[in-house]
């Protein structure tokens, strides 16, 4: 109904993450793990943490990989470890397909999450599960009540488990490792583009030696300077 996919718009806007007040008895590592929302080595920052779900949807629809991305981001709150609280990005995919993405975690703003898939003939909207023509007129509308009467199971999480158990019983392989890795790397390349202010390519990120893990994986005190806030336009991360 929508024809060949030419572009998409993905967004995820919500309030701020929880801030964990540090207790005196916590080591640096325990503090970061308990407040994992606020440290990029634990939660991956907002693109990998939130927008990735809609990136995954777009990748599934198109069955394409991104060629490159240019992104930017910043942080309004300063007491949130080393993560940003807003990002914006522009992906170029194979075959000239484009994806615009935005994610924000700031209180007091208008919120919402979803994706629009734009085709040559029309568009699909996750907000109301509708298909619209180029004039914006709805030409198809998902009917949840009709779906309930047609299918015995309609909960997506239950369907996932049914598919998994079905493959186990049949002795067949259910392997989504590549699709999961593709979506994860798509999110990471956008984050790294925003952190550095540089355009990132799929080749760069898929062969990158990037390792964000602490030097010592134990509940001990560490040098927190190694977890500085990324500063675009510089070769290294820097403190606020």
Residue ranges and their predicted role:
Residues 1-80, 109, 113-116, 123, ...:
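Predominantly a Rossmann-like dinucleotide-binding segment in NAD(P)-dependent oxidoreductases
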Residues 3-5, 95-97, 170:
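Loop/turn elements at helix/coil->beta-strand transitions in domains of secreted/extracellular proteins
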Residues 19, 101, 126-127:
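Short helix/loop capping segments that flank catalytic or ligand/cofactor-binding pockets
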Residues 49, 53-66, 70, 86, ...:
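C-terminal helical cap and adjacent loop that interface with cofactors, partners, or active-site loops
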Residues 71, 91-92, 102-103:
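Short beta-strand segments that buttress and anchor functional surface loops
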Residues 90-96, 118-120:
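Active-site beta-strand termini and strand-to-loop segments that position acidic
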Residues 99-101, 107:
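Phosphate/diphosphate-binding loops
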